[in-house]
Amino acid sequence: MATTNVLATSHAFKLNGVSYFSSFPRKPNHYMPRRRLSHTTRRVQTSCFYGETSFEAVTSLVTPKTETSRNSDGIGIVRFLEGKSYLVTGATGFLAKVLIEKLLRESLEIGKIFLLMRSKDQESANKRLYDEIISSDLFKLLKQMHGSSYEAFMKRKLIPVIGDIEEDNLGIKSEIANMISEEIDVIISCGGRTTFDDRYDSALSVNALGPGRLLSFGKGCRKLKLFLHFSTAYVTGKREGTVLETPLCIGENITSDLNIKSELKLASEAVRKFRGREEIKKLKELGFERAQHYGWENSYTFTKAIGEAVIHSKRGNLPVVIIRPSIIESSYNEPFPGWIQGTRMADPIILAYAKGQISDFWADPQSLMDIIPVDMVANAAIAAMAKHGCGVPEFKVYNLTSSSHVNPMRAGKLIDLSHQHLCDFPLEETVIDLEHMKIHSSLEGFTSALSNTIIKQERVIDNEGGGLSTKGKRKLNYFVSLAKTYEPYTFFQARFDNTNTTSLIQEMSMEEKKTFGFDIKGIDWEHYIVNVHLPGLKKEFLSKKKTE
């Protein structure tokens, strides 16, 4: 069933280290290329056909180009996207879905996008495609564009492939793997386990070794032009000062004492030793301990760092781009403002505050909340693909962050804006008199204040001991654990260098900046938090509540 479906569709920390490769110019074409029309040209021609634009407006677009207009072509993003096919992991995740939507909406002549999915059979994979992507509200602009042919278009372009990043050859059946390897131009590594306190064995298998398995598959792809991997800006571990856009290599900016096989052995021994709930608890603790031992905050950033190092060591001559976003939150503009899937890093705290569950937290109000909207991350990735997808074997890192600019978002400002919005527009109909959140500089002060809040609000006093009830203790432990997990971010003071990212923006034409813009300097943080992100977050929360 799987083979028939897919085959049928195929026919329709040295901190100041440097990258080992530089960017080389493309060789000039020695033939007369067919003329490709920009989005502006297409739109004006269409408007003229329907009587909305004058003939002169169209003819002005097709007059011979001057030297100045030639230089305005920018990177050539739309030209690069035409006819390209992709293999995407993590396709049903928050970031990947936004990226897929953008590719489908902006590239009229896109090839196929193969989506690696864990499913028991092709029917289940097709159902996941429909339930999690095709029917998602995120794709409503595409639905408007294609009308009644929307589903047919999506099923023609999006091909679910049964596989698993934790298996050799990605767990794809050989005949399907062979077919895909003949078609794809770009691999987009977007999958991963994002829980900060994940069990160590799972985080190692997916985040550390998964990219290597994907890279090995890519080396067998005949016309692969680029391997693009999404990492995290916090991948460099505990740092102060400026975090540069440099590759991670074991023996250079990752200690040579780190032995991946030894870490896997430790995790395997823990799995054999513990069972049930004890197993999960011990494996989470092991991940935290190993990350701390090597200088990382948690098992997520630690295993993502190993994953980057694996890519760097195994890449060979394959062109590689690493995208390192900071805290990805809801869309700024596209496909519409405020779209979010699930809750991101700061959101559980905001929602708990909105529901009146907490009015205190542990943080430094001056710490940098390095937030970046998801649509800007997608746009940057597309621009980087076009820039580096010419087959030149270079290794480029891009920090997609906001703290390097003059107006970074700080924790205190985020709290102030959240209080302002939630007082004016409460989360639910129940009126809660929200106090301004009190920020504590010590964990002890936060724990004491939260304990008093729980006693006061829920009246869960143990009659015998005068302390918290079992329910109250669980609530206290949950929020204290959350505060500890977020401590590296709520007390973050380093700034991320984004020289490479700035250079990429400068190479883009004006039209490319309008269509694929990701200049963080243009973000109005007050507008984004109050009018975009919080309304989007509330909408997501209420929609999830209805389905529960």
Curated annotation (Swiss-Prot):
Write out the catalytic residues in the record. Answer: 300, 304
Give the subcellular location: Plastid, Chloroplast
Keyword NADP found: yes
What triggers or suppresses the expression of this protein? Induced by wounding in the epidermal layer of mature stem internodes.
- What does the entry state regarding organ or tissue expression? Highly expressed in stems. Also present in flowers, leaves, siliques, pollen and roots.
Q: What EC number is given for this enzyme?
A: 1.2.1.84
Which SUPFAM superfamilies does this one have?
Answer: NAD(P)-binding Rossmann-fold domains (SSF51735)
Q: Where is the transit peptide?
A: 1-47
Query: What GO MF annotations does this protein's record show?
Result: alcohol-forming long-chain fatty acyl-CoA reductase activity; alcohol-forming very long-chain fatty acyl-CoA reductase activity
**Which reaction does this enzyme catalyse, per its entry?**
hexadecanoyl-CoA + 2 NADPH + 2 H(+) = hexadecan-1-ol + 2 NADP(+) + CoA; hexadecanoyl-[ACP] + 2 NADPH + 2 H(+) = hexadecan-1-ol + holo-[ACP] + 2 NADP(+); a long-chain fatty acyl-CoA + 2 NADPH + 2 H(+) = a long-chain primary fatty alcohol + 2 NADP(+) + CoA
Q: Which domain of life is it from?
A: Eukaryota
Known Gene3D superfamilies for this protein?
Answer: NAD(P)-binding Rossmann-like Domain
Question: GO annotations under biological process?
Answer: lipid metabolic process; response to wounding
Which top-level enzyme class is recorded in the Swiss-Prot or TrEMBL entry? oxidoreductase
Phenotypic effect of disruption: No discernible phenotypic alteration in the growth and development.
Query: Which keywords appear in this protein's UniProt record, sorted alphabetically?
Result: Chloroplast, Lipid biosynthesis, Lipid metabolism, NADP, Oxidoreductase, Plastid, Transit peptide
Q: Where is this motif: NAD(P)H-binding?
A: 86-96
GO cellular component terms, semicolon-separated: chloroplast
Say if the entry is tagged with keyword Secreted.
Answer: no
Q: Please give the family membership noted in the entry.
A: Belongs to the fatty acyl-CoA reductase family.
Q: What does this protein do?
A: Catalyzes the reduction of fatty acyl-CoA and -ACP (acyl carrier protein) substrates to fatty alcohols. Triggers the accumulation of C16 and, to a lower extent, of C18 fatty alcohols; converts palmitoyl-acyl carrier protein to the corresponding C16:0 alcohol with NAD(P)H as electron donor. Also triggers the formation of some C16:0 and C18:0 aldehydes. May be involved in the generation of C30 primary alcohol.
Name of the protein in its database record: Fatty acyl-CoA reductase 6, chloroplastic
Source organism (scientific name): Arabidopsis thaliana (Mouse-ear cress)
Tell me the name of the encoding gene: FAR6
